[in-house]
Amino acid sequence: MISIVLVSHSQKITEGLQEMIVEMVGDTVHIISSGGTGDGRLGTNALMIADNIATCTNSEHIYIFCDIGSAILSAETALELLDTELLEKTTIIDAPLVEGAFTAAVQSLVNPSKEAILQELTNVH
């Protein structure tokens, strides 16, 4: 199984996207909402993102999709907090949040290999 971590300044955005992806692919992909600061405010929280990634220990690959600049910085900071095993299987993806996460989830149903997912994401703009 793969995991997809959704990072946005808005919890509502990541929860809505999580709902949409789960509706399409079911529970075959572990989708995690990491939007907002964790206390209902807009913003990002690197500690929360790292804690959410830590729930993915059973995943073969973990992909992080972010919305805008500082969300990417928070995701990068979260990676610095991970142990080596989790870090080695975690990738921040340079793709649009909605289209990228959706494409990765659907592609994982066809071919869950990291190479296949990354290749399919090259078509997402």
UniProtKB/Swiss-Prot annotation:
Where are the catalytic residues?
Answer: 9 (tele-phosphohistidine intermediate)
Q: Does the keyword NADP apply?
A: no
UniProt xrefs under SUPFAM superfamilies: PTS system fructose IIA component-like
PTS EIIA type-4 domain residues are 1-125
Protein's GO biological process: glycerol catabolic process; phosphoenolpyruvate-dependent sugar phosphotransferase system
Q: Which domain of life does this protein belong to?
A: Bacteria
| GO molecular function, a single term | phosphoenolpyruvate-glycerone phosphotransferase activity
Q: What class of enzyme is it?
A: transferase
Give the induction text.
Answer: Repressed by GolR.
Q: Output the Gene Ontology cellular-component terms.
A: cytoplasm; membrane
Intracellular or extracellular location(s)? Cytoplasm
Q: EC number(s) in its UniProt entry?
A: 2.7.1.121
**Which keywords describe this protein according to UniProt?**
Cytoplasm, Glycerol metabolism, Kinase, Phosphotransferase system, Transferase
Q: Hey, which family's this protein in?
A: Belongs to the PEP-utilizing enzyme family.
Tell me more from the record: Unlike the carbohydrate-specific transporters of the PTS, the complex DhaKML has no transport activity.
Q: Could you give the domain comment from the record?
A: The EIIA type-4 domain is phosphorylated by phospho-HPr on a histidyl residue. Then, it transfers the phosphoryl group to the EIIB type-4 domain.
Described purpose of this protein according to its UniProt entry:
Component of the dihydroxyacetone kinase complex, which is responsible for the phosphoenolpyruvate (PEP)-dependent phosphorylation of dihydroxyacetone. DhaM serves as the phosphoryl donor. Is phosphorylated by phosphoenolpyruvate in an EI- and HPr-dependent reaction, and a phosphorelay system on histidine residues finally leads to phosphoryl transfer to DhaL and dihydroxyacetone.
Q: How does it assemble?
A: Homodimer. The dihydroxyacetone kinase complex is composed of a homodimer of DhaM, a homodimer of DhaK and the subunit DhaL.
Q: What is this protein called?
A: PEP-dependent dihydroxyacetone kinase 2, phosphoryl donor subunit DhaM
Instruction: Tell me what organism the protein belongs to.
Output: Listeria innocua serovar 6a (strain ATCC BAA-680 / CLIP 11262)
Lineage per the UniProt record: Bacteria, Bacillati, Bacillota, Bacilli, Bacillales
